[in-house]
C-alpha cells in the first residue's frame, strides 16, 4: 500500500518510491511496529491508509502515511480514516494530534479542517532537496 501511495502521489510524502521499493519484509515490519496503522478496504482491496503514533516527547500523537486511492476519494474514506486516527489517539491518552500536509494540497487540508484540525503556523520542507513546504496542523483532543 505504501509503494502504491508513493507511485500515485510522490509529491505528498517525505520519501520516494525509489528509496523504499527495495525494502525487505523485516524493514517494512520494523517501520510500523511503533505505530497503529489503519487500512480502509473495499471488496477486499486496500483503498486507503493512515497511521498514528507518538509525535515525540510529551502527550501529542501524530498522523502519518495518510493516503486514499484516487478512485475512493470523495466517498468518505478519508473521513473514516481521520476519525479512526483521532479515536486511536484519544485511546492512547494523547492530548493533541498533529499532522503535516503539503502546503498546496487543498483537498487534504479541507478534510482535516472538517474534523477540527487547524494550522499551527509551522512549516518545513517536504524532504531534503525538495523546495516544497508542508504545514503542520493540530487538533486538541
Show which residues each predicted segment covers:
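Acetyl-CoA-dependent GNAT
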Residues: 1-71, 82-84, 88, 92, ...
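Internal amphipathic alpha-helical segments of the cytochrome P450 catalytic fold
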Residues: 60, 74, 108-109
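Flexible nucleotide-binding loop
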Residues: 75, 79
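C-terminal "cap" of GNAT-fold acetyltransferases
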Residues: 95-98, 102-109, 114-141
Amino acid at each position: 500500500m505504501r509503494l502504491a501511495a508513493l507511485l500515485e502521489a510522490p509529491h505528498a510524502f517525505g520519501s520516494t518510491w525509489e528509496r523504499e521499493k527495495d525494502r525487505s519484509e523485516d524493514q517494512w515490519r520494523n517501520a510500523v511496529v511503533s505505530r497503529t496503522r489503519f487500512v480502509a478496504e473495499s471488496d477486499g482491496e486496500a483503498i486507503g491508509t493512515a497511521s498514528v503514533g507518538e509525535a515525540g516527547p510529551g502527550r501529542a500523537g501524530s498522523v502519518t502515511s495518510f493516503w486514499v486511492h484516487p478512485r475512493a476519494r470523495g466517498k468518505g474514506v478519508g473521513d473514516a480514516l481521520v476519525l479512526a486516527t483521532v479515536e486511536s489517539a484519544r485511546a492512547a491518552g494523547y492530548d493533541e494530534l498533529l499532522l503535516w500536509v503539503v502546503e498546496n494540497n487543498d483537498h487534504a487540508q479541507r478534510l482535516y479542517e472538517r474534523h477540527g484540525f487547524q494550522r499551527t503556523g509551522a512549516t518545513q520542507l517536504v524532504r531534503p532537496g525538495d523546495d516544497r513546504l508542508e504545514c503542520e496542523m493540530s487538533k486538541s483532543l
